[in-house]
Amino acid sequence: MVISRAEIYWADLGPPSGSQPAKRRPVLVIQSDPYNASRLATVIAAVITSNTALAAMPGNVFLPATTTRLPRDSVVNVTAIVTLNKTDLTDRVGEVPASLMHEVDRGLRRVLDL
């Protein structure tokens, strides 16, 4: 499977545990393409939620369903970054346009103080 940055996939994040994201939900690949193309078995992603109220949180990015092919309007939660096995990514949903990825990158820089 060829995985690219800015793609959205469904992933099983496992059972709920504290405040960690869980269950089957969409994730946005944020790892760079050279790493995606490498022999690494893992991928870094940001969790996507349909709780659009989280768009008000600094750094989070609103994703319109019409732009991403998600079933409903959603939000990239830049504070919910996960490392997954590439095999945990199942159905490809779509891709985040460059303009919104720029906002995601800005949010990641903010939350990680880069």
From Swiss-Prot:
Keyword Transcription: no
InterPro entries registered for this protein in UniProt: PemK-like (IPR003477), Plasmid_toxin/cell-grow_inhib (IPR011067)
Gene Ontology terms describing biological process: mRNA catabolic process; negative regulation of growth; positive regulation of growth; rRNA catabolic process; symbiont-mediated perturbation of host process
GO cellular component terms listed in the entry, alphabetical order: extracellular region
Pfam families for the chain: PemK_toxin (PF02452)
Phenotype upon gene inactivation: Individual deletion of mazF3, mazF6 and mazF9 have little to no phenotype, but a triple mutant shows increased sensitivity to oxidative and antibiotic stress and starvation, decreased formation of persisters cells, and a decreased bacterial load and pathogenic damage in infected guinea pigs.
Entry keyword set: Endonuclease, Hydrolase, Nuclease, Secreted, Toxin-antitoxin system
Highest rank taxon of the organism: Bacteria
Compartments where located: Secreted
Main localization (coarse): secreted
Induction: Strongly induced (17 to 25-fold) by nitrosative stress, starvation, when grown in a non-replicating state, in the presence of gentamycin or rifampicin.
UniProt EC number: 3.1.27.-
Any one GO molecular-function label of the UniProt entry: RNA nuclease activity
Function: Toxic component of a type II toxin-antitoxin (TA) system. Upon expression in E.coli and in M.smegmatis partially inhibits cell growth and colony formation; its toxic effect is neutralized by coexpression with cognate antitoxin MazE6. Acts as an mRNA interferase on ssRNA, cleaving between the second and third bases in the sequences CUCCU and UUCCU.
Assembly behavior: Forms a complex with cognate toxin MazE6, which neutralizes the toxin. Interacts physically with non-cognate antitoxins VapB27 and VapB40 which neutralize the toxin.
Family: Belongs to the PemK/MazF family.
Protein name per UniProt: Endoribonuclease MazF6
Upper taxonomic lineage: Bacteria, Bacillati, Actinomycetota, Actinomycetes, Mycobacteriales
